[in-house]
Amino acid sequence: MAGVRVKICGLRTESDVKAAASSGAAYVGLVFFPKSPRHLELAQAQRLALAAPPGVAKVALTVDASDETLDAIVEAVPLDMLQLHGGESPERVAEVRARYGLPVMKAVGVADEGDLPQILEQSLAADQILIDAKPPKGAALPGGNGLSFDWRLISGRHWIRPWMLAGGLTVENLAEAVRRTGASQVDVSSGVESAPGVKDPARIAAFLQAAR
């Protein structure tokens, strides 16, 4: 698995950020979604972003956020990328990208083969694609649910943008996930937690060690 880049998402404390960065994370994800146990207020997120060392990309995750909400986040928090994790259309992705001049990662939920065309559609507007497990109907959260999808659905496929694999990844299944999908980037949140929203430094270190 040499060279797999890792995003640790849903960090809530400065020590979380330091644990991720010191273990070799390429990205740290900050969640702005009040329904999530990983949600951050702006002042808290600003502190976390400032704690990230140079070379670690700071990503803000939002869900169907308004321009007003995004304006406030971008103004308060030093960021390297925006992650849109709701039902945003390719047109909305393009709007956000143009408005802020930041790279945009668009999440696409996958449950079956019928979801795959969205990956190409969103690739036409986004800079990167996050391929995640589609949440069950009625789920409160669009991601971070600890669910995976059938990795065979994307085995051997290629897209026009860099992409990242997410959904139920853990230190135990990471090697198989990468082998089946060919992912060169992965995203983990609940898989390195001791409780919802509570990151475990030992699990973070173990996951990043497994990704090397």
Curated annotation (Swiss-Prot):
InterPro entries, sorted: Aldolase_TIM (IPR013785), PRAI_dom (IPR001240), RibuloseP-bd_barrel (IPR011060), TrpF_fam (IPR044643)
Enzyme class (EC, first level): isomerase
EC number: 5.3.1.24
Domain of life from the UniProt record: Bacteria
Reaction it catalyzes: N-(5-phospho-beta-D-ribosyl)anthranilate = 1-(2-carboxyphenylamino)-1-deoxy-D-ribulose 5-phosphate
Keyword line: Amino-acid biosynthesis, Aromatic amino acid biosynthesis, Isomerase, Tryptophan biosynthesis
Cross-referenced CDD domains: PRAI
GO MF assignments: phosphoribosylanthranilate isomerase activity
SUPFAM superfamilies: Ribulose-phoshate binding barrel (SSF51366)
Gene Ontology biological-process annotations: L-tryptophan biosynthetic process
Pathway: Amino-acid biosynthesis; L-tryptophan biosynthesis; L-tryptophan from chorismate: step 3/5
HAMAP family reported for this sequence: PRAI
Annotated family: Belongs to the TrpF family.
Name of the protein this chain belongs to: N-(5'-phosphoribosyl)anthranilate isomerase
Provenance organism: Cereibacter sphaeroides (strain ATCC 17023 / DSM 158 / JCM 6121 / CCUG 31486 / LMG 2827 / NBRC 12203 / NCIMB 8253 / ATH 2.4.1.) (Rhodobacter sphaeroides)
